[in-house]
Swiss-Prot record:
Mg(2+) binds at residues 14, 40. The gene is pcrB. Its EC number is 2.5.1.n9. This is Heptaprenylglyceryl phosphate synthase. Transmembrane segments: none annotated.
Amino acid sequence: MYDISGWKHVFKLDPNKELSDEHLEMICESGTDAVIVGGSDGVTIDNVLHMLVSIRRYAVPCVLEVSDVEAITPGFDFYYIPSVLNSRKVEWVTGVHHEALKEFGDIMDWDEIFMEGYCVLNPEAKVAQLTDAKCDVTEDDVIAYARLADKLLRLPIFYLEYSGTYGDVELVKNVKAELKQAKLYYGGGISNAEQAEEMAQHADTVVVGNIIYDDIKAALKTVKAVKGE
């Protein structure tokens, strides 16, 4: 079993986006700590299965970030379950989770499942619109969400999601200083190695996503920038 607490760099692949076999191989053989499969829309059991089978040709750990209960399938190493803490809709905080547990609770392997406390900070992002996230928040608000995830709910992961835009480095630094046991994931807007390295100074895990589809070479350079290997 892999230890997620040591992961510094992960790639996130959207099953609803096209990625060539050649580029997938580059991602999986890049030295990244893991590949997360997940997206905000268009996620189906068919494209999740296609992605799973493709990634399983390689040794890299593989995680499904669950956004649709209907797209869950066995075969991943871990399952990340996001709870959008700044959503205005209870369904994205605990609602869909409750429904999933009613249906699948008896057969779930709890050693494979990790809850993520999400704080979505880009109002233009699909995930913000889907979950009706309250993005016009102050630093004090974000710190409070971090404390909620870390100290009250005792979640293993607190995820700052800027999704498509590069985040506030000082805020990331201050959030990290608040966390005692939760790991800080940062995702959003990383388009080059310099940005990845900058965020890696504060976040425990840097998530690289969109740049994979825009500039594969730049995406690959983020691995060494974060891990320093």
